[in-house]
Amino acid sequence: MTPSLFPRRAALRPIALAASLALLPALALAQAAEPKDANDTLNLNRVVVTGTATSASKMKQSVSISTLEADQILKLSPTNAAEILRSIPGIRSESSGGEGNANLTVRGLPISAGGARYVQFQEDGLPILLFGDIAFGTADQFLRTDYNLSHLEVIRGGSASTLASNSPGGLVNFISKTGEEKGGAAGLTLGVDGGRQTRVDLDYGGSLGNGTRFHIGGFQRVGEGDRKTGFNAASGGQIKANITQDIGSGYLRLSLKALDDKTPSFLPVPVITTNGRIQSIAGVDPRTAFFINNSTPQDLVFGADGKMVSTNPRDGLRVKSTAIGLEGSFKLGDGWNITDKFRHSTNSGRFIALFPADNGTPVAGASKFTATLFNTSIDDLGNTVNDLKISKTFGNAAGGKATVTAGLFTAKQQVALTWFWNQYSVDMKGSGAGATFTTAGWDTWGGCCVRNYNVAYETTAPYAALTWEAGALTLDASVRNDKQKASGFYQEDNPIAKTWDPATRKNVNYQLSHTSYSLGGNYQLNKDLALFARASDGVAFSADRLLYGTPVDGSVPVASNGVKQIEGGAKLRAGAFSVFATLFSAETRESNYEATTQKFTSNKYRADGLELEVGYRAGDFKLTGGATYTNARITASNDASTVGKTPRRQADFVFQLAPTYAIGALELGAAVIGTGKAWGDDANTIVQPAFTVLNAFANYQFNDRLSLSASANNLTNTLGYTEVEGDGHAARAINGRSVKLGLKYNF
């Protein structure tokens, strides 16, 4: 069944909907999100709230932070959250997997098994999921960007380790509109090259009077997705809404979210690796290949309740999420402030994607390959989170001021999934491939992957921060104590009886704690130049990655993943030119389990580098960009042969350039994203070649309300590999060229 959050007529007749909306009377013009100072191309004057104890401008904060406005993001029609983040310096974001299950990290911290272990995804200051690397259940799966988005704040390193849990690498905060500006927009987007798709976006917000304001918006789409799949692989939508009541010097806010969506997932495809070089196989283009189609049979799997379930591989990544949030913030007088944020979310779904178990070898020119269908039920990834913060500001006779902050973060995250992976013989064809069932999940890969687990992770994290500001100097220190309690079970199957095996059921019952710290300072030499430095220590606790290995019943110590960082840099505005430069060094220790290789690892890493973010404006021409140089090494490992090697998929150099030029009512722009050569494995035997991707857009403004746009992702159809299996039989690449046309009406 096609998921739907809007009336069926809206899903089937988006053009009629857009046309009717265009006839609405003009209520207000949508105000473009431009900085007040047109030359402040990096928006260094924007006040940021993410991962900081006190609200202050980017120029005054002692952290590396980037911001993106909604209009910057929407112009290039990004296909997923990971693609948005590729434009942020210091972020390594692999956007090749579709609208979820992305791999992401910062500043040379490792991507050892997938997801975003060291980076927390947030919506409006609270985590979407408490852990960033849950197998088949990453935070970006439950995140969609649409017209509800106000702006994006991204912190690398810094105080992220003490002002949020499981985020020593950084924070990515998607901040919603709250009705402060009256108006809205309706948009229609059509996919015309690449995958066929139709999408309708709508939002509106404003004042209801008496200090009450609201915002509501969402999207509905149907189509193939970002590759030609031959069926409606992408179908669904989202609604978000909030209402705010201003009360004296504070406010109360209620927010709601409903997401019901399915999208295709893109996993590695069969390739051949010769002398460390990846080569595609005839008939299988890694940029476009998709082996699931209308002829793919239903997949019969074993459920958590012990019953067989018939599933449809064409559902791909199917997610459902509902959330309700409450937020309040008040100034109590005499320097006292209190803020509390609460959210309860239910998250569930199913992940289905085809992974090559081989590449058809040893027979040269093989017409078929063996595929494992990763079919994982996301039974429950719901959570309840609350962040309470109280602060007091003290002045002194010397004109300085100190702010003391105390907070308490609490969370309960459920992690309940069921795996059952059948195998198929699949035609070696990038489209229209036939698939024949061969092996039931009871026997796939030796029966390793019939799994069921249900674990509750409870986190209690008190934290405190002290900020002292005297003239041009700001100093801050913060500390956080994360305590995690895990309880539940995990079990495997009895392949003979074909049921869950009580003998394999293991209890989960352990506790962990870690105290993190962060010390920083910022000195503003003048209004256009500031220097900053910081040292921090943080932790990322693991969840399901610890199961099916060392006992987690409390009988032996449980490992955690730690990061120590130092950084220092400068922020400069010089006329039309702006630069944000940071030197960094990070040490990481981690333990890990990887589903595709069935291996446990224990490694230590070090990464040193330089991060640059620049901006320039000359009349109607604007350029923003960045570059990151990283020297990363494995410094210790349970596999001694990898010590001294470069961590897999870590390029020494990556860069981003985004020029735009306005010619009257026409605006032209591009995003050039490049990555240097990387190794595909920790042994450094397989090369992932360097590649550069060109995205482009054109936007024509007919009048103050109506605009027409065209955007292209991977305009030159570049082949760029983002990962390869350690034995070289399969690799994943970015999507090939896709082109979209959009019509937007502001009202």
Describe the residue ranges of each PLM region:
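N-terminal Sec signal peptide and the immediately downstream disordered periplasmic leader
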Residues: 1-87, 324, 605, 616, ...
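Extracytoplasmic beta-strand/coil segments of soluble accessory domains associated
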Residues: 82-127
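Short acidic/polar hinge/loop motifs at secondary-structure boundaries
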Residues: 127-156
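Short strand-turn segments of transmembrane beta-barrel domains in outer membranes
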Residues: 171-207, 217-229, 671
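Repeated loop/turn-to-beta-strand initiation elements of outer-membrane beta-barrel proteins
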Residues: 182, 211-214, 249-254, 336-338, ...
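Acidic/polar loop-and-plug regions of large Gram-negative outer-membrane beta-barrel proteins
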Residues: 244-246, 251-323, 350-376, 429-450, ...
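Structural signature of Gram-negative outer-membrane beta-barrels, strongest in the C-terminal barrel
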Residues: 381, 399-413, 448-588, 607, ...
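Gram-negative outer-membrane beta-barrel transporters
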Residues: 472, 576-589, 594, 600-683, ...
